[in-house]
C-alpha cells in the first residue's frame, strides 16, 4: 500500500523513476545478515533441537526482542535446525494450522525448503553471508520486492527502473568478500564508502528505516 501511494504521487510529476531496490541484497544491508552470521559462528550445534531450544530459549527470555531483531529472536525462541529455520520461517506443524489440507501443508513446506536448499548449494559455501545474500536475491527479491513494486507502480502507469540490479553490476558485487560489505557492524560498508564523495554524511549514516505503514491506519484514512 505505501508503494502504491508513493507511485501515485510520483506519477503526477514524472513517468519514470529510479529505485534503490537490490542494495540490501547486494551489499548485505539487512539486519538479519548480521544476526545470522553471529548465530552461524556460535559453537552450539543447531542440529540438536533439545539442547538448542533449552539454551536459546533461556537466552531469549533474558534479552529483549528489540536488541536481537525479529529473525534472531525467532531462532532463539524456536531452537530449530539452523538452515531449516532460515529458509522456512514456519515449521510443518505450524503450516498444518495454516492449511486445511494436511497433505498440502506438508508438501508445500518440503518443496519450499528443498528449493531453497538447492539454491544455497549453488552459492558461495566459503562465505556464509554471501550465501544468504544469494538466497535472498534468488527468492525474496523477485518473488516479493520486485513483484510488489511492479504491481503498485504499473497500477499508476509509472515505470520503475532498478539500476543496482544491472546484471553486470550484480555479478561484480558477488566478487566482493562479505567482509567488505559488513565491517565493524556497519552494513553496506564498501557501498557507502564509494558514495561518500557524492552523498551527504546525514544520508550515508542515516539509521536503517523500513518502508512500511500500518494497513489499518491507511484504510482508516
Question: Which residues does each predicted region cover?
Answer:
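ATP-dependent adenylate-handling active sites, centered on carboxylate activation for C-N bond formation
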Residues: 1-111, 151-198
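A general structural signal for short secondary-structure junctions and capping/turn motifs
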Residues: 7-10, 131, 203
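A short, charged helix-loop
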Residues: 108-121
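Structural motif
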Residues: 123-136, 186
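Globin-like tetrapyrrole-binding proteins
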Residues: 141
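PAPS-dependent sulfotransferase catalytic core
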Residues: 199-221
